[in-house]
Amino acid sequence: MNVTAPELSERQRRILRLVVEEYVTTGQPVGSKALVERGGIDVSPSTVRNEFAALEALGLLMHPHTSAGRVPTERGYRLYAGSVLERMEARPGAFPLDLTSVRREVDDALQATTEMLSRVTSLLALVSAPPLETTTVRRVEVLLLQPDVVMVLVITSTGGVTKRVAAFDNAVDPGLAAWASEYLNDRVAGLTLGSGLLRQRLADPELAAQERRFLETLRPAFSGAAEDEQRLYVGGAAGLFDEVREGEFASYRRLLEILEQRAALLELLRGSLDPRRPFVRVGAELEHPELSNVALVGAAYGLAYRTLGTVSLLGPVRMDYDKAIRSVHSAAAELSRFVEDVYDEH
């Protein structure tokens, strides 16, 4: 989040913070008299109005035509969120995510994280799965469903399960299906999805012609598993419109449309990623003109030596940044501890 902070007095910073937090809570423009009456600043309403004018001149507040109050601009939100990042310290237990009861599967942990994040923040939660090059084949099962129908199960190191069904022109020899299971678990299990070595093992020239043809028919199960691993877990879409204010509906509708474009969302998350600390992108920083009223808050999770993915929240620019930033930071830390344990086991 690259925000060139204007020179503000301590009082101006305080007033900006109070305006943002009040507007986030109420969705209504904030007036000088109301700000003083609610406490938090010991100056007169006229002094607050003067500071409002100064902050407006700096492009941090704006004055809606129908109200005497002020609301934050995108730049104001960015500056406020930047101040939250600067003063943020990890708070143990700040986010109620407990993965101790989750099965030792990364997929389950990612799903649990999105569900809890969306429930706690009332925002759209996005968690990206580990990249393909970190995912291996754990086990393969080749099952004869009917004399001429075979189902292949590919179970990955993240706990993902891909099923593919192949129909043959003639009955399949049960011995061939049993051989395929044994061969794949012996020669393919442990290999990285999408790797050249995996593809070579599926087309080993030393195999008999019948065996190679059979494995060729099963190949889509492995390419399908690779595609499935490019996953984005989403939570909270059903409640996305619960607190939308007038003027925000168009951006929210567009947000739901973009949810259908998982590849674009994954690219957005990768482009925003900062492995060192939580990140915030507001409005135009998302580089989607239709998302001018939307903000993204996220944090990286992973192993000590590499980043595996992101834990993110999407919502209105009028969001509780303090809560959102602390939530993704705590959730990413907990998820990192989980995957460290799981990857150590493998």
Q: Where on the chain are the PLM-derived regions?
A:
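Residue-level marker of regulatory loop/turn positions in helix-turn-helix DNA-binding domains and
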Residues: 8, 28, 244
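N-terminal helix-turn-helix
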Residues: 19, 25, 29-84
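Short, conserved sequence motifs enriched in acidic/basic residues, glycine, and aromatics
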Residues: 6-7, 42, 71, 171
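Short alpha-helical segments that sit at the start of domains
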Residues: 1-17
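A short glycine/serine-rich beta->alpha loop
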Residues: 2-4, 61-66, 318
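Intrinsically disordered, acidic Ser/Thr/Pro-rich low-complexity regulatory segments
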Residues: 78-87, 91-312, 316-346
